């Protein structure tokens, strides 16, 4: 691959990124005026840099404490949150639920699935808390890491899938008992056909999907077809735009503010709303350096030997036809500048969701 393709779409310069920060500073958390509200909530991972920055100032303060984070989401103009709730006592449950009801905010939880019989008590305690809080859903992941990084062969993938099935079979009676929707994310772990087969095998009313609108692209699934196929199973959504660019071993995939990336967010919104008109979605935008998807390497294909070449061709064609103008590379920045960009990314996304997507 020629280097001039990379040079035609440079990464965001520090000056350009700081200009983006300045443009969005009017509605971040520490602004003096309360921003307008979007229905789009925030996944806790969006604010990981701010959490780290705040803990450096005060090690005892945790932005991700559920009520603290829900108030932060309200303050920046988001419509709710997705975060780990853990196990909360009755007073904390009441405070969280009352605040959410008063402010009309959605709450999603995050939970680890039960590893084995010995882990069921922990899992049920967290699900009971989620039920008492009144969550829309509880998001989970059942396979570790990104498929093309975590595993070396298809056999390893199949072994992890078997463990995932066992964990979800353990979880099913508990989430059914408490009537809590367990939403399994497409986490760059299974291709679309594999994930649909998992849902059909489980056939549980309370096990469905966290539809991540970008992850399936990393496994060469059709960018919009995957969302359409997963949408009927959706209990919640990781709503994201992503910037694409070729590199010598495949393509780069980077979270970017809504409307600034390579995907048609209006089309994605329409697909999801058509299938689930009342679903409340959560922005997932992790401010970090781009991820590498090495789809032109032997190691990548070792875990997906039966995927056809036309899927690769479609994916690379999409990357070439929809290159983002900029990518954000922030790893070398100071923590203070990173948190400013993180705030600005969230602010710009909520503004786009509110003004363009009517969310």
Regions found by a protein language model. Give the residues of each.
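Catalytic domains of carbohydrate-active enzymes, especially glycoside hydrolases
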Residues: 64-87, 134
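Histidine-acidic metal/acid-base catalytic patches
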Residues: 2, 17-22, 32-41, 46-59, ...
């Amino acid at each position: 691959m020629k280097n001039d393709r990379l040079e035609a779409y440079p990464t965001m310069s520090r000056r350009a990124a700081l200009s983006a920060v300045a443009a969005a500073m009017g509605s971040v958390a520490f602004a003096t005026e309360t921003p307008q509200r979007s229905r789009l909530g925030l996944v806790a991972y969006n604010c990981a840099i701010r959490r780290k920055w705040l803990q450096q100032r005060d090690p005892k303060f945790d932005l991700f404490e559920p009520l603290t984070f829900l108030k932060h989401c309200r303050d920046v103009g988001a419509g709710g949150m997705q975060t780990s709730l853990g196990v909360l006592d009755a007073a904390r449950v009441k405070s969280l639920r009352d605040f959410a009801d008063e402010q009309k905010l959605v709450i999603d939880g995050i939970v680890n699935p039960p590893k084995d019989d010995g882990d069921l008590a922990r899992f049920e305690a967290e699900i009971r808390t989620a039920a008492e809080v009144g969550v829309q859903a509880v998001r989970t992941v059942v396979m570790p890491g990104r498929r093309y990084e975590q595993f070396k062969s298809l056999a390893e993938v199949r072994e992890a899938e078997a463990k995932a099935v066992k964990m979800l079979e353990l979880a099913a009676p508990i989430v059914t008992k408490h009537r809590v929707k367990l939403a399994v994310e497409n986490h760059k772990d299974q291709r679309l056909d594999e994930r649909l087969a998992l849902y059909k095998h489980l056939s549980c009313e309370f096990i469905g999907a966290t539809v991540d609108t970008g992850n399936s692209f990393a496994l060469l699934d059709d960018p919009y077809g995957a969302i359409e196929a997963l949408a009927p199973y959706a209990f919640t959504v990781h709503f994201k735009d992503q910037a694409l660019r070729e590199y010598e071993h495949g393509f780069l995939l980077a979270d970017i503010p809504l409307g600034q990336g390579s995907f048609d967010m209006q089309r994605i919104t329409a697909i999801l709303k058509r299938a689930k008109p009342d679903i409340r979605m959560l922005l997932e935008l992790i401010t970090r350096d781009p991820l590498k998807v090495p789809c032109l390497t032997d190691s990548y294909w070792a875990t997906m030997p039966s995927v056809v070449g036309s899927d690769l061709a479609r994916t690379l064609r999409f990357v070439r036809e929809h290159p983002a103008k900029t990518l954000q590379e922030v790893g070398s920045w100071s923590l203070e500048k990173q948190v400013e960009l993180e705030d600005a990314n969230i602010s710009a996304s909520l503004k786009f969701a509110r003004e363009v997507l009517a969310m």
